[in-house]
Amino acid sequence: MTNADPHELQKFSDLAHRWWDPNAEFKPLHDLNPVRLAWIDSHAHLAGKRALDVGCGGGILSESMAGLGAQVKGIDLSTEALGVADLHSLESGITVDYEAIAAEAIAAREPGTYDVVTCMEMLEHVPSPADIVAACATLVKPGGWVFFSTLNRNLKSYLFAVIGAEYIAQMLPKGTHDYARFIRPSELAGFVRATDLHIVEIKGITYHPLGKRFALSNDTDINYLVACRRAA
């Protein structure tokens, strides 16, 4: 059985044609992308590396990593999103190999293949995030890097990421997030400990509404990033 929620897949498929509009529903991803890309590159030094973007959607991060010199493959289960990603890759001239395949399936097919594996803003949308973490750990080479980002589960994250972002500021479409699926850092750390990965760094992401920008911080109450490495 595929580790995917059909409702979640449909939700993002319906918006696929808007993925590369920096002022539409995916504006937060466009605004967030430079911050997370720089953070990933600071650890993994992407140039010349083989990278896999799990849950790549329309390819915002995938193309950005390729633009820094990585050989990138992006996977997703939304064929609509992948169609948009392919088209944008042709328009931009930045080569990314996209495939509609589950993380667990590609992990069985290509274990220990990638220098870098990213799984950003995806874990909170799947029924079993632990299985995705395990798949990412299987996919990365010994000594390689795995990066996750997700949303913490607490009152503050509910107020800001759901009520604030979806209903008040309307930065995101209503229903984008299911609070019950948010993941505490301690829970994600538990998923990581069950694999061959170890956590190198956890950073928060803070949104500054006056400047309308994201920045790294030590506040992990809402959005947070986790850098992991597989033992060499």
Curated annotation (Swiss-Prot):
Enzyme Commission number(s): 2.1.1.222, 2.1.1.64
Domain of life assignment: Bacteria
UniProt function note: O-methyltransferase that catalyzes the 2 O-methylation steps in the ubiquinone biosynthetic pathway.
Keywords: Methyltransferase, S-adenosyl-L-methionine, Transferase, Ubiquinone biosynthesis
Molecular function terms, GO-annotated: 2-polyprenyl-6-hydroxyphenol methylase activity; 3-demethylubiquinol 3-O-methyltransferase activity; polyprenyldihydroxybenzoate methyltransferase activity
Species of origin: Burkholderia multivorans (strain ATCC 17616 / 249)
Protein name, entry field: Ubiquinone biosynthesis O-methyltransferase
Disulfide pairings: none
Enzyme class: transferase
Any one Gene Ontology BP term: methylation
NCBIfam families: UbiG
Family: Belongs to the methyltransferase superfamily. UbiG/COQ3 family.
Catalysed reactions, semicolon-separated: a 3-demethylubiquinol + S-adenosyl-L-methionine = a ubiquinol + S-adenosyl-L-homocysteine + H(+); a 3-(all-trans-polyprenyl)benzene-1,2-diol + S-adenosyl-L-methionine = a 2-methoxy-6-(all-trans-polyprenyl)phenol + S-adenosyl-L-homocysteine + H(+)
Binding site for S-adenosyl-L-methionine: 36, 55, 76, 120
Pfam family, one: Methyltransf_23
The protein's annotated pathway: Cofactor biosynthesis; ubiquinone biosynthesis
